[in-house]
């Protein structure tokens, strides 16, 4: 059970050459992991808010320096010292810190990158691949049904004779 030592955010570029957020989480046991927040080509009205700087002089307004500052200051300070294995607590702390319905204050790009980097750190700390680490969290319900019945309820009688 390693605790979060620090979190570092930075601006990187996605596959389309647009700025996006990368977060790196460092644990007290010297394990670290990074995650990059993806950004879609189109956004819907009810999606979480992707925080962009809107400064037309920097990458046509698409830079994410404010979201990176949120990671390096607000988010890092809030999550430092928390157990990285408690993903639910980490995510709740991120939601509480943001305080908005659609992550307008910190930016969904910042919170997602931090959350994913933390889960990758926890998986590494537990010496498991991420899919196995997360796979232990969820399980599918096992359907219970009766496919083959016994014959105890069937009454077998003599066949009836045809009427003459």
Regions found by a protein language model. Give the residues of each.
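Short, Gly/Pro- and small/polar-rich lid/capping loops
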Residues: 1-19
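Glycine/serine-rich anion-binding loops at beta->alpha junctions
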Residues: 13-15, 19, 99-118, 143-153
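Short beta-strand scaffold segments in enzyme catalytic cores
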Residues: 21-25
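Short acidic-glycine loop/turn motifs at beta-strand connectors
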Residues: 26-31
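Well-ordered beta-strand positions in beta-sheet-rich domains
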Residues: 32-36
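Metal- or metallocofactor-binding catalytic centers and their adjacent structured scaffolds
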Residues: 38-128
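Glycine/threonine-rich beta-strand-loop-alpha-helix active-site module
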Residues: 123, 127-144
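Single conserved hydrophobic/aromatic residue that forms the stacking wall/gate
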Residues: 154-164
């Amino acid at each position: 059970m390693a605790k979060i030592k620090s979190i570092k955010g930075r601006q990187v570029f996605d596959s389309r050459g647009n700025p996006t957020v990368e977060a790196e989480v460092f644990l007290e046991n010297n394990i670290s992991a990074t995650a990059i927040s993806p950004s879609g080509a189109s956004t819907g009205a009810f999606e979480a808010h992707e925080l962009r700087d809107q400064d037309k002089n920097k990458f046509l307004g698409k830079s994410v320096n404010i979201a990176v500052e949120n990671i390096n200051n607000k988010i890092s300070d809030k999550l430092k010292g928390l157990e990285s294995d408690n993903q639910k607590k980490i995510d709740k702390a991120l939601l509480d810190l943001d305080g908005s319905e659609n992550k307008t204050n910190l930016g969904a790009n910042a919170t997602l990158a931090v959350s994913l980097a933390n889960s990758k750190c926890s998986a590494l700390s537990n010496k498991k691949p991420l899919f196995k680490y997360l796979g232990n969290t969820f399980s599918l319900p096992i359907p219970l049904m009766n496919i083959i019945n016994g014959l105890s309820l069937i009454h077998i009688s003599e066949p009836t004779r045809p009427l003459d």
